[in-house]
Amino acid sequence: NGAILKITGGEPLVQQKALLKFLEYMEAEWGWIPRIDFETNATIMPDKEWVRVGATFTTSPKMSNNGDPEDRRYKPEVLDWHSINASGFKFVIDKESDLDEVFGKYISPFDIPTGRVWLMPCCGSREEHIEKAPMVAELAKKYRFNFSPRLHLLVWNMALKV
């Protein structure tokens, strides 16, 4: 029927067993399930059942500019799974040198095609977004990545605390 269920917020794969039960309920009650798309930080391996139901994934790996320790935010086996399973990759960029990490820890080691990569400005307000977006958009053009604005900042001028 064309319905898409986008599952995001914090790390949704923490709840993947419960979400699979929810899908079973939907299928039993309605006779169909929507297309599922996750936004994940790529630290938890998706259950193989998600592949069976055709779920798609957008990964947003936390980079060192996030401040979390590397052992909590960088899981090579999970990143490898996402690169093999055609997930999209979204990176929050503060400055051009952040691309050293994007290429060195993600693009090159996992052979991620540039067409599956989105860059977003690292910012906490509408004003900061307006200031940084042109630089990030130019980097996206230069390296043949996609660019995505942070719509919640542009529309509501508020950062999401997830």
Model regions and ranges:
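Conserved AdoMet/S-adenosylmethionine-binding subsite of the radical SAM
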Residues: 14-162
